[in-house]
């Protein structure tokens, strides 16, 4: 779910893609199946869900987390969606993986620093390296 400005605002470069790319199926089912197989074979825990992109650079309030859940979001961040929109604009196949660094669950929300978010992401790095190496092969 994109709640940020579209990266396609401005003059379209038709050599790169159509003005209004179809986003009804932004992620490649084949790539998702490959990633799931790799995660399962590597015994890496994963979950599927709906990602919401916001502008940031602030972290969300409890009320915002609640709103994002109501509209169908399972995870929230400030990236990924613009890159997917651009990839689909260029007719590229893609999928997305996110590292969940903190919980926005009502009653479980704790203050978190950017440094703590970076540490959680760094902890997930070996699993992401495994996925990327195997998906490229």
Q: Residue locations for each model-derived region?
A:
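Glycine-rich phosphate- or other oxyanion-binding loops that anchor nucleotides, phosphorylated ligands
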Residues: 1-137
């Amino acid at each position: 779910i994109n709640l940020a400005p579209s990266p396609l605002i401005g003059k379209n470069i038709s050599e790169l893609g159509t003005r209004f790319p179809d986003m009804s199926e932004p992620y490649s089912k084949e790539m998702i199946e490959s990633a799931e197989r790799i995660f399962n074979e590597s015994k890496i825990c994963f979950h599927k869900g709906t990602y919401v992109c916001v502008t940031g650079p602030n972290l969300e309030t409890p009320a915002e987390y609640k709103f994002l859940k109501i509209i169908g979001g399972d995870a929230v961040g400030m990236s990924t969606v613009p890159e997917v929109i651009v990839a689909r604009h260029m007719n590229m196949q893609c999928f997305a993986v996110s590292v969940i660094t903190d919980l926005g669950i009502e009653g479980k929300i704790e203050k978190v620093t950017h440094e703590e978010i970076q540490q959680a992401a760094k902890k997930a790095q070996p699993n992401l390296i495994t996925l990327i190496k195997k998906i490229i092969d």
